[in-house]
């Protein structure tokens, strides 16, 4: 019978009434972007890795190699993005050897979306896949459930709103390589300054037609830790003692035992 199904809604209400709390969604805590230009494509990412409210890693690499000319940026669960990109990278290499031709970006896209769809979102990997092949330059985004998108500029992660604001206001047709790198870097910095889940440095990867990818690790370091201008160690006695109280929390008893007998 055609129509809407409210089975899941009724199930969720039943579980809530029986003290079963709904699972909380994991924040992607990242800013990643991709921008196409005249002769290729650029992807960029921040380098902050978080564990809840804690910064777990200040210089985490979020740009992953799939093949010499195909790279992807990952947001979501770090272990998932690392594992899934390594798996697809291996499969792409085997596919390239079997077909005796340069791997296509759409092949990596198809492998990724089929793998993620199979697990129904339980693999928390949100990816921007970019690369060049004999058919040209390509830029795609993939969500954890397997849905995909294509565009001239894309952004994912918790800082994607700030990044997309920069991309939409500054993108133009026929960008040069330098302009695309600057636009992607500015978009990542917008995420760094406006999203608590993003921070530290900016990584960039440039893929041009006819060339292998150029990985620019720590392309920008807007959060360099400066040296303190003076010492903040204070000598003992700087803070006055207003009151002193000594409490005996145990009694010490001494007993001598003669062991000569």
From Swiss-Prot:
InterPro entries: Ntn_hydrolases_N, Pept_T1A_subB, Proteasome_bsu_C, Proteasome_bsu_CS, Proteasome_sua/b, Proteasome_suB-type. One of its GO terms (molecular function) is endopeptidase activity. Its main location: cytoplasm. GO terms for biological process: proteasomal ubiquitin-independent protein catabolic process; proteasome-mediated ubiquitin-dependent protein catabolic process. Keywords: Cytoplasm, Hydrolase, Nucleus, Protease, Proteasome, Threonine protease, Zymogen. Residues 1-29 form a propeptide. It is an enzyme of class 3 (hydrolase). It is found in: Cytoplasm; Nucleus. GO terms for cellular component: cytosol; nucleus; proteasome complex; proteasome core complex, beta-subunit complex; proteasome storage granule. Its EC number is 3.4.25.1. Signal peptide: none annotated. PROSITE patterns: PROTEASOME_BETA_1, PROTEASOME_BETA_2. Disulfide bonds: none annotated. Pfam families: Pr_beta_C, Proteasome. It catalyses: Cleavage of peptide bonds with very broad specificity. The active site is at 30 (nucleophile). The 26S proteasome consists of a 20S proteasome core and two 19S regulatory subunits. The 20S proteasome core is composed of 28 subunits that are arranged in four stacked rings, resulting in a barrel-shaped structure. The two end rings are each formed by seven alpha subunits, and the two central rings are each formed by seven beta subunits. The catalytic chamber with the active sites is on the inside of the barrel. Belongs to the peptidase T1B family. The proteasome degrades poly-ubiquitinated proteins in the cytoplasm and in the nucleus. It is essential for the regulated turnover of proteins and for the removal of misfolded proteins. The proteasome is a multicatalytic proteinase complex that is characterized by its ability to cleave peptides with Arg, Phe, Tyr, Leu, and Glu adjacent to the leaving group at neutral or slightly basic pH. It has an ATP-dependent proteolytic activity. The side chain of Thr-30 acts as a nucleophile, and the N-terminal amino group acts as a proton acceptor. Present with 11400 molecules/cell in log phase SD medium. This is Proteasome subunit beta type-2. It comes from Saccharomyces cerevisiae (strain ATCC 204508 / S288c).
């Amino acid at each position: 019978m055609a129509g809407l199904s409210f089975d899941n809604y009724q199930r969720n209400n039943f579980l809530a009434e029986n003290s079963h709390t709904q699972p909380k969604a994991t924040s992607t805590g990242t800013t990643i972007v991709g921008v196409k230009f005249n002769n290729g494509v650029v992807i960029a990412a921040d380098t902050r890795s978080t564990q809840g409210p804690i910064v777990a890693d200040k210089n985490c690499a979020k740009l992953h190699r799939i093949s010499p000319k195909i790279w992807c940026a990952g947001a979501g669960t770090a272990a998932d993005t690392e594992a899934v990109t390594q798996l697809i990278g291996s499969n792409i290499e085997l596919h390239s050897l079997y077909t005796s031709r340069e791997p296509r970006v759409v092949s990596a896209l198809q492998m990724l979306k089929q793998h993620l769809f199979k697990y129904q979102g339980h693999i928390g990997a949100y990816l921007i896949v970019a690369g060049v092949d004999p058919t040209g330059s390509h830029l795609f985004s993939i969500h954890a459930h397997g849905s995909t998108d294509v565009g001239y500029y894309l952004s994912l992660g918790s800082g994607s709103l700030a990044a997309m604001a920069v991309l939409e206001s500054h993108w133009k047709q026929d960008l040069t390589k330098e302009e695309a790198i600057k636009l992607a870097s500015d978009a990542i910095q917008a995420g760094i300054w406006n999203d608590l889940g993003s921070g530290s440095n900016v990584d960039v990867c440039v893929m041009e037609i006819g060339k292998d990818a150029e990985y620019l690790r720590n392309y920008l370091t807007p959060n360099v830790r400066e040296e303190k201008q003076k010492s903040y160690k204070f000598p003992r006695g700087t803070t006055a003692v207003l009151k002193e109280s000594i409490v005996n929390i145990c009694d010490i008893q001494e007993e001598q035992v003669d062991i000569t007998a």
